[in-house]
């Protein structure tokens, strides 16, 4: 859901920027650019979190592969 929300925020920012530039409202254009930047940052943080989870799951999986009789915590969600 976060990915969709981030994309929507980025698109909304692009629209604001375009309207601001078309009407000569530099403040609105700046606000649109800021919205796009914020959406890009949120997306990057979300992607980084996903990569960390994937890495943790691989590490946990490698321990299970070595000794399946040892109990391990659930995979990171």
Swiss-Prot record:
It comes from the Bacteria. Transmembrane segments: none annotated. Gene3D superfamilies: YjbJ. Residues 1-77 are annotated as: Disordered. SUPFAM superfamilies: Hypothetical protein YjbJ. InterPro entries: CsbD, YjbJ_sf. Residues 30-56, 64-77 have a biased composition (Basic and acidic residues). It holds the Pfam family CsbD. Belongs to the UPF0337 (CsbD) family. This is UPF0337 protein CE0198. It comes from Corynebacterium efficiens (strain DSM 44549 / YS-314 / AJ 12310 / JCM 11189 / NBRC 100395).
């Amino acid at each position: 859901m976060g990915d969709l929300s981030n994309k929507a925020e980025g698109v909304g920012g692009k629209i604001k920027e375009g309207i601001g530039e078309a009407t000569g409202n530099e403040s609105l254009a700046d606000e649109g650019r800021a919205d796009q930047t914020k959406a890009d940052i949120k997306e990057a943080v979300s992607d980084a979190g996903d990569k960390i989870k994937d890495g943790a799951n691989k590490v946990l999986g490698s321990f299970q592969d070595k000794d399946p009789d040892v109990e391990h915590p659930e995979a990171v969600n």
